[in-house]
Amino acid sequence: MNMDDGSGLFGCRPVLCVESVARSIAYYVQCLGFRLGLTWSGREQRFLHPHEATEPDFAIIGRGQVQFMLSQKSQGPPGIWLHLDVHTPEQLDSLYEEWTRNTANIIEPPSIRPWGMYEMRVQDLDSHMLRVSAPPRTAKGAS
């Protein structure tokens, strides 16, 4: 689906309110395989260098074409739902295996949902729900 209307809008990075940016970075990086983009200290009004001892209160993380902003105790309520797409059921199964090995909080393993999509649900430390979705497998020989 292409919704380009010439407005210039090209991306969306949800801001997740978290209790601790440092703990959330560790969860997303170690359990879910995200990468850390940048960190910011509001108290010091500056970007932080990697592995600096100062605790961040804002960060950007990403994996693939998905990016989230993590904001400590601000910018919205905890516990929102995010829908992440992958192209194939095999990619979803691979993420499930990886995240299970890394002790991610899998709420629902992959299954076909009543609406026909192959999905799983994973929850982070602040009750944000990641619904990861793929189209269902097709029968062999189907076009």
Q: Which ranges hold each PLM region?
A:
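Core segments of cupin and vicinal oxygen chelate
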Residues: 6-8, 15-66
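Short, solvent-exposed beta-strand edge segments and adjacent coil->beta transition regions
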Residues: 9-13, 77-81
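Vicinal oxygen chelate
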Residues: 18-22, 63, 82-129
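Residue-level detector of high-confidence beta-strand sites
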Residues: 37-39, 109, 132
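A short, polar/charged loop-to-alpha-helix boundary motif
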Residues: 48, 137-143
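Short hydrophobic/aromatic beta-strand or adjacent loop that forms the aromatic wall/cage
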Residues: 56-58, 79, 117
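Conserved beta-strand in the GNAT
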Residues: 68-71, 121, 130-131
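A short acidic/small-residue loop/turn micro-motif
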Residues: 75-76, 114-115, 135-139
